[in-house]
Amino acid sequence: FLGAESPGFELNDLGRLSSADDIDSEFFVNYRETQPGKVFRNYRLGLATANGWNFGGTRTYSVVRINTNQTWKNWWNSYVGIFYRPAAMSDDLTRGGPLMATVPGGGIDAQVFTNEAKNIQVGFFYSASWNDLGASANSVRLNFRARPGSRWQFTVAPSWRESNNARQYIGVYPGGTPATYDERYVFSWVKQTTLSMQLRLNYSFTPGLTLEAYAEPFASSGNFSQYGELAAAETTTLRAYGTDNTTIAQDPSGNYVVTDGNNGQTFTLPNNNFNVLSYRSNVVLRWEWRPGSALFFIWQQNRESDCSAGYD
């Protein structure tokens, strides 16, 4: 696969384009064994690579991935994938500012499912990633599905995720050095923890009258720390606030006041810590009162509580 969007390319009303000035390539090769063996009924091995450049010839990302999935003799299914990202230059981390270096990193993800033909099926997902700055992410999800009878089925899927991002963009402020074109591109460390659960229930009263219900409680919190500004274009190094002749302190409102002793400038960074609780649900009663004609009765609710001034 090879695709490109030239600088200044606009889709307007034709669709959505997240970025332009991109040249993207993808290559993948798979080996599939379909003859049952002593351990597996079938399996697949895959190798894939993806690369991106801008029209100036700067490599903006690369990734190499190896993955495999298997169907076992007992009809269980499993998957394992490993990926590696070498260093590159990002043209979007500074949100329209200078290029910023990215560091090498990698990750792994795996899943296993029991036999889906059974009345009870259990699935487990795990993923982890990391990079040379010390950033990391770990997530776990459990999927439990049961069919107690021919009329109904329910699914419970709790999940947990914790991430540590070493370069979370905060904003751009005036007063930077010539190395960053006289602007301050401010970043921070953010630790985020998320808990959620998906609940589904399907029930058939008759072939023409069915009930489908979905609910998802959700909780997430984030803590921002270790603020600093990009030291120079095409690097990943931050000039950490509180060092290098700078000070940082919280004011009574909880925001952070930064003073640069080199030029005497003072500016304020918002306190972006957040705690969010939400609950979404959807219930649909479908009645096919005659062949080809159906009535739907839908009840939805979406509740959210932001316990602090969060960060978007």
Language model features: what each stretch is:
Residues 1-312:
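Exposed, low-structure sequence patches enriched in small/polar residues
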